[in-house]
Amino acid sequence: MRKLLNMETWSRRDHFHFFSQFEEPFFGITADIDCTIAYDACKARDCSFFLYYLHKSLLAANYIEPFRYRIIDGAVWVYDQVNASPTINRPDGTFGFAYMNFEQDFHLFLINARIEMERVRHTKGLEPAIAGENVIHYSSIPWIHFTAISHARSFAFKD
């Protein structure tokens, strides 16, 4: 579900109109975060760290209302929930796009996410933008150390 944000009473209205004029109105911040304790806990429980941090980031995104905002046809919509659309590696060296519903309960999220990962690993090609507007796109590249990433984006294609 979603609801239209009331632009007349929104404190960020002027900021929205100003930055909406930019071809690329996005900004990003990167930071090093020590996840050693969480990583070690996952490994001790034979739990996927990827799915653990994916769930925790979705938990935070769903808690913070502006992370659930989406701009559609010039209007700001507030979704009740945002979900994940991560890239999933395949045995042939390619990747596919997955869609994972957010669940408060980590174990339920884990069960459903594993099923979706297996589904994507057994497909070929790409299915972009099938997840809808209320997703966060994720890419995990654990084999390199980096402090920033920029994703390819086509502004003419609603994504």
List the predicted regions and their residue ranges.
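Helical lid/core segments from catalytic subdomains that handle acyl or acyl-like groups
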Residues: 90-146
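Intrinsically disordered, low-complexity linker/assembly segments
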Residues: 152-159
